């Protein structure tokens, strides 16, 4: 298997652009794509429920582990098991922290990973909105 990637592979500038992309800022997503970091733009979009971006990560990119990360953030048990199996320890901790796992959140705080904590907080907001949006009876199709 090819070398697996991690969010720790990226410098601060790119992670800040990723954070802004998570917030939906198209300028930052375009910046990531223009600078050959389409995988970060796709991950931001996949976390925001873009199924085409998720499909691209999983099947067409060299970053399927980021597609698995998106699924793990959504709580898919097989994705969590995949991250464990392939020893993607940081991505696993990240996904668990995004799911509000106390031990994982404490690990990020203990290691003073402030930027990752900011990203995790943004993903918490996204997941909360997605949960609210899916339970809104006014949005359901019958």
Predicted segments, located by residue:
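Ankyrin repeat (ANK) tandem alpha-helical domains that serve as protein-protein interaction scaffolds
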Residues: 1-142
């Amino acid at each position: 298997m090819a070398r697996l990637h991690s969010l720790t592979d990226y410098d601060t500038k790119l992670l800040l652009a990723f954070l802004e992309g998570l917030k939906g800022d198209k300028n930052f997503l375009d910046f990531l794509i223009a600078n050959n970091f389409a995988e970060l733009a796709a991950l931001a979009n996949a976390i925001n429920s873009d199924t085409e971006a998720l499909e691209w990560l999983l099947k067409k990119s060299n970053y399927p582990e980021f597609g698995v990360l998106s699924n793990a953030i959504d709580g898919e048990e097989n994705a969590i098991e995949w991250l464990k199996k392939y020893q993607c320890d940081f991505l696993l901790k990240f996904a668990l922290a995004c799911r509000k796992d106390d031990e994982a959140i404490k690990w990020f705080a203990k290691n003073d990973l402030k930027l990752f904590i900011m990203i995790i907080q943004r993903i918490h907001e996204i997941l909360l909105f997605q949960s609210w949006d899916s339970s809104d009876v006014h949005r359901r199709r019958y």
